[in-house]
Amino acid sequence: MARPASPRSGSGKSAGARPAGARTEKPPFFSPATRAFVVARAREMAGFALGVVGLVLMVILGSYNPADPSWNAVPAADVHIHNLFGRFGAHLADVLIQSLGWAAYLLALVPMMWGWRLSLQKSVRHPLFRSVLAVWGVLMVAMFLAGMGTGSEDPLKSRPGGSFGGLLLDGVSRLLFGSPGNPLVGTVAGVAGGLILFVAMGLSIREWAASLRETAAGLARLGRGARTGLSFVRDKGAEAARSAARQTGGLLRREPSLATAEKTTAAPTLDDTPDEDGGAITLRAAPRGRLSDSISVEPRVEAKTRAVPVVTSPAGGKTKAADQGRPSKQAALNLEEADGYELPPLDLLQIVPTSVRGEKVDEAALRENAVKLEGVLSDFGVRGEVQKVHPGPVVTLYELEPAPGTKSSRVIGLADDIARSMSAVSVRVAVVPGRNVIGIELPNAKRETVLLRELLAGDVFDKTAGKLLLALGKDIGGQSVVADLARFPHLLVAGTTGSGKSVAINTMILSLLYRLPPDRCRFIMIDPKMLELSVYEGIPHLLTPVVTDPKKAVVALKWTVREMEDRYRNMSKLGVRNIEGYNARLREARADGELLTRRVQTGFDPDTGKPIFEEQPLDLKELPYIVVIVD
């Protein structure tokens, strides 16, 4: 058997052999990330150092005093040095002020700007060239300032451009115009010097604009702070004056309280400044109802021949409660009226007129529509029979039993075609769970108006055991629907403009006002639009006036969170889980004459080291429900 040739056989070189003279590249000492980190930190340190140099130079120039010792004056031995950096600062400031005048401050501004750029991880390109430009710019600004001198003994007033600025201005003026101190030369030099310094500092136009905006914003904040301080002092002064007037015999006028009920906790004080600690409030939408939730399920009648669709008459006085809002049977609430408060009568609401109740159901027309609907479905290849018809105030439900083998998705996909063929605006098609029928909802030619009085006067609203019962309207069968808000963690009402959100909110509010007194239910209403909830201003159920300021709304919501936490703590003291159990426990203790106490540890016995417990009485009051409404 032949052996494979070895890769080293013969004089041939291996494929991986390195050519002669090739150098091996060594890996870098620092990785790219480490190098970038070191460069960034070095740039920040350089920027900090330049900023410190510029700041020190600015302080040296700012604390300049002509009486300090300098190289051109010999002061007394015990002279006081005013410069903050001592003798060195005095000599340096004297040299710069005497040479450049006010322009010397620009020498301190340039390194400060460079340091600011480096601290922001921005490079300063061509630093040597920019340094030369900075010197030239300072000299030209000194020329401009030299033409503004006065006859004062102060060198900054007599020679604001320093000796260098005066010499340059006079020399250039004599060279161009034959006379010293020409103002045109000084003006041109000042403009050119400003442009040169603009380039020397290394700032772009965008950065200059940003710095100007930040400066303006800082000045604006200082102005607002000053105004706030002045208004605070003014308010304190006015309050002190009012207090003094009351003490000297003025009439003591009591301001109305935000909370009108005596058995409730203190209402939130809506200050302009929100608290620091706040809680987040999570809103969860109620589950979207299915078609089956509003369809009345009746026993199916078997028939071998084609059955005439059964027309179910809409409900008259009978009503039903919504499945999701129906509470289990419980003890009736003790709805004792508050002192001086009476529940509003139904006479305040509009009586349901005959024209609004709708005309009597025309069963012949409904059967005709059922036959027409079967014909439309047959045109699209769907066979089936309409078993029942449920007319309602807004829509009419047709229960279609399709022929065996018909897919539900095929019928659901024909919704738009059914609407076109039936001359309807829209059609809703869905499967009724648990039954072999498909529900087809067609809008009525005339919509029935549902009035609140009809809902509140119904048996279900009066007899259903609920804590915060809401009248929501009618279902597709014409039966009233109520729900208990206490069973919902939150209730979110959403919809487009004109869809009835405001009507729904007002209906819910009135449902609570017609059922519960202020000592059982309190409201916090937030209406930044100042349109919908302002009509409830002044009702005794309000914990606070209707909140229209968004800042005060934040305070009100934070107060609500704190009140919720306090209630949880009080419930834990009594060992109950909800407000109803808490109030029932208090009523039971009050009826039995029992004093509610809590066993707490107050310390340890010094002799035995065992804990010492005491029974502390609990001063607890019944809690009302608090409903927060945000529009």
Swiss-Prot record:
Its main location: membrane. ATP binds at residues 498-503. Residues 1-27, 243-277 are annotated as: Disordered. Residues 206-631 are cytoplasmic. The chain crosses the membrane at residues 44-64, 95-115, 131-151, 185-205. The keyword Cell membrane applies. It is a multi-pass membrane protein. One of its GO terms (cellular component) is plasma membrane. The keyword DNA-binding applies. Pfam families: FtsK_4TM (PF13491), FtsK_alpha (PF17854), FtsK_SpoIIIE (PF01580). It comes from the Bacteria. Keywords: ATP-binding, Cell cycle, Cell division, Cell inner membrane, Cell membrane, Chromosome partition, DNA-binding, Membrane, Nucleotide-binding, Transmembrane, Transmembrane helix. It is found in: Cell inner membrane. InterPro entries: FtsK/SpoIIIE/SftA (IPR050206), FtsK_4TM (IPR025199), FtsK_alpha (IPR041027), FtsK_dom (IPR002543), P-loop_NTPase (IPR027417). GO terms for molecular function: ATP binding; DNA binding. GO terms for biological process: cell division; chromosome segregation. Homohexamer. Forms a ring that surrounds DNA. Belongs to the FtsK/SpoIIIE/SftA family. This is DNA translocase FtsK. It comes from Azospirillum brasilense.
